[in-house]
Amino acid sequence: MGILAVILDSVCERCSGSSLWMLSTVALLSILVVSVVINVLRQLLFKNYKEPPLVFHWFPFIGSTISYGMDPYRFFFNCREKYGDIFTFVLLGKKTTVYLGTKGNDFILNGKLRDVCAEEVYSPLTTPVFGRHVVYDCPNAKLMEQKKGPNGVFDVCKTIAEITIYTASRSLQGKEVRSRFDSTFAELYHDLDMGFAPINFMLPWAPLPHNRKRDAAQKRMTETYMEIIKERRKAGSKKDSEDMVWNLMSCMYKDGTPVPDEEIAHMMIALLMAGQHSSSSTAAWIVLHLAASPEITEELYQEQLRILGHDMPPLTYENLQKLDLHAKVIKETLRIHAPIHSIIRAVKNPMPVEGTPYVIPTSHNVLSSPGVTARSEEHFPDPLEWKPHRWDEAIAVSSEDEEKVDYGYGLVTKGTNSPYLPFGAGRHRCIGEQFAYVQLGAITAALVRLFKFSNLPGVQTLPDTDYSSLFSKPLGNSKIQFEKREPVTKA
């Protein structure tokens, strides 16, 4: 006690002569050091061998959030090498169990509704973007009109975002909606996209700059759709066209309740987001790869000449199905650059992992990353090389006799045993998969028949990937050169 008293007296004496700022700093540092020590001791001394191994981390709450957020795939592969296919890491205070490989995809994406829940995870992200009571909140011609010279430089991400929002709005929502859109709407959708920042899993309401832009964009988009609906209601039942807005305006829920106008507007935001977002990222990667591989661009052009003819008829759905190499370019780009790197579910019941001693508790989330199998040497030789011709040989991506399930939008294969799942699997598999292939095919074919692409002088590599949002896309400067093709003359 004598020694302790001396120490306390010494501390009190020093504190009495220190400023409040200094004392606050010392206190915060002390709390930080103590929390780190306790966190490390808990990991080393109190391991639960019935749960998957926990990725070592220094700071509580933060855990592995930074290393995961900077490059998810590098994080996954590094952890896989150290811990195996099943491991747990702390993501913004929440223990998240990752299960990689085809077995992991099946375990999570085909998890029973009573065991895993997507709504609980994604609602804080999607509700402020789409609006309430929709999605997870409920139980190319125009480019050519923007004339440029015969050659020049353009920003791929910005331009492709405009193209995809024009094509998606016209094909999914009709002529009137498309007529309301200009290039500023691509910027609004970018602001909505930033609402999917990982921090919004925990703090969707935080008054951060990207959240203020998200809310303003959501309000502007809702007002645009509400104006269209209001004008149509005022005009009565007379239809000048058939589109999704008209369709929903006459729809009812099972109990006979008409779909409210605000919910229709929010559904339209979600529909356009689904039709624009991942397609925009994928189409941008396609163009960037074509600029880095001009020989593939020329092969695509020659395929159109050979199959469609030198008169280059307008693109139709039937014509797109004949362009085999175009389809392979899309598949290969989706393989390397899957728009969503992490698919997360909340655990609702303890989940035993077959063949292991692990039981995943309800305090965890579970995470599947189909992009890991698509980038694995065991399934695809030279997995990080962009090689559309790898698809010339049959690659087992699905099985005809695989079990099929109807989740409410028609029979689809469960699909989770495939190493190639760019559109996910299970009950939350992307229902717009076929539309995406048609949209990407039309954009790719239209650009290839009109332009040649090349990298800027001195540029040898593609941009890195931006993982700052839930949806990955090219990072930073994505400018390339274009050159208009000369009209084809018949031989």
Swiss-Prot record:
Belongs to the cytochrome P450 family. This is Sterol 14-alpha demethylase. It is found in: Endoplasmic reticulum membrane. Keywords: Endoplasmic reticulum, Heme, Iron, Membrane, Metal-binding, Methyltransferase, Monooxygenase, Oxidoreductase, Transferase, Transmembrane, Transmembrane helix. It catalyses: a 14alpha-methyl steroid + 3 reduced [NADPH--hemoprotein reductase] + 3 O2 = a Delta(14) steroid + formate + 3 oxidized [NADPH--hemoprotein reductase] + 4 H2O + 4 H(+); a 14alpha-methyl steroid + reduced [NADPH--hemoprotein reductase] + O2 = a 14alpha-hydroxymethyl steroid + oxidized [NADPH--hemoprotein reductase] + H2O + H(+); a 14alpha-hydroxymethyl steroid + reduced [NADPH--hemoprotein reductase] + O2 = a 14alpha-formyl steroid + oxidized [NADPH--hemoprotein reductase] + 2 H2O + H(+); a 14alpha-formyl steroid + reduced [NADPH--hemoprotein reductase] + O2 = a Delta(14) steroid + formate + oxidized [NADPH--hemoprotein reductase] + H2O + 2 H(+). Its EC number is 1.14.14.154. Heme binds at residue 430. GO terms for cellular component: endoplasmic reticulum membrane. It is a single-pass membrane protein. The chain crosses the membrane at residues 20-40. The lineage of its organism: Eukaryota, Fungi, Dikarya, Ascomycota, Pezizomycotina. Disulfide bonds: none annotated. The gene is cyp51B.
